């Protein structure tokens, strides 16, 4: 049974501008060490940061603003086959995600069962 659905779109340039203004403070407030490391392993980290930000926002929408949920404790990482997955401490439901980024935008779609 589907318990929640969420979608979000993020302008890559928006994430870049926030980073240029706030730097590490922004990164450390929103992203895990793994997400930061993964994103900055690419020549242009901003599409990857934007995609992860979009997933976090879509998860929050799907969970209808569950108490105690923050952007930072929603972690997007790649599993053994390279596909993205979401990990939330203490959360046991299945989270399906789809992420895409192309030039100016990143989008994420989340289904929770």
UniProtKB/Swiss-Prot annotation:
Predominant location: cytoplasm
MF terms (GO), sorted A to Z: holo-[acyl-carrier-protein] synthase activity; magnesium ion binding
Localisation per UniProt entry: Cytoplasm
One cellular component (GO) term of this entry: cytoplasm
UniProt: Mg(2+) binding residues: 8, 57
Enzyme Commission number, as recorded: 2.7.8.7
A Pfam family: ACPS
Catalytic activity: apo-[ACP] + CoA = holo-[ACP] + adenosine 3',5'-bisphosphate + H(+)
Keyword Lipid metabolism: yes
Gene3D superfamilies the UniProt entry points to: 4'-phosphopantetheinyl transferase domain (3.90.470.20)
Co-factor(s): Mg(2+)
GO BP terms, alphabetized: fatty acid biosynthetic process
Keywords from the named record: Cytoplasm, Fatty acid biosynthesis, Fatty acid metabolism, Lipid biosynthesis, Lipid metabolism, Magnesium, Metal-binding, Transferase
Family the entry assigns: Belongs to the P-Pant transferase superfamily. AcpS family.
Role this protein plays: Transfers the 4'-phosphopantetheine moiety from coenzyme A to a Ser of acyl-carrier-protein.
HAMAP family with a match to the protein in the record: AcpS (MF_00101)
NCBIfam families associated with the record: acpS (TIGR00516), pantethn_trn (TIGR00556)
UniProt name for this protein: Holo-[acyl-carrier-protein] synthase
Organism phylogeny: Bacteria, Pseudomonadati, Nitrospirota, Thermodesulfovibrionia, Thermodesulfovibrionales
């Amino acid at each position: 049974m589907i318990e929640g659905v969420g979608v979000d779109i993020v302008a890559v340039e928006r994430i870049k501008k926030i980073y240029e203004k706030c730097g590490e403070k922004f990164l450390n407030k929103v992203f895990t060490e793994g997400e930061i490391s993964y994103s900055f392993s690419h020549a242009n980290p901003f599409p990857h940061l934007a995609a992860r930000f979009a997933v976090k926002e879509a998860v929050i929408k799907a969970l209808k603003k569950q108490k105690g949920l923050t952007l930072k404790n929603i972690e997007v990482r790649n599993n053994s086959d390279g596909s993205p997955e979401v990990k939330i401490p203490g959360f046991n439901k299945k989270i399906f995600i789809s992420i895409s980024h192309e030039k100016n935008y990143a989008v994420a779609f989340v289904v929770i069962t």
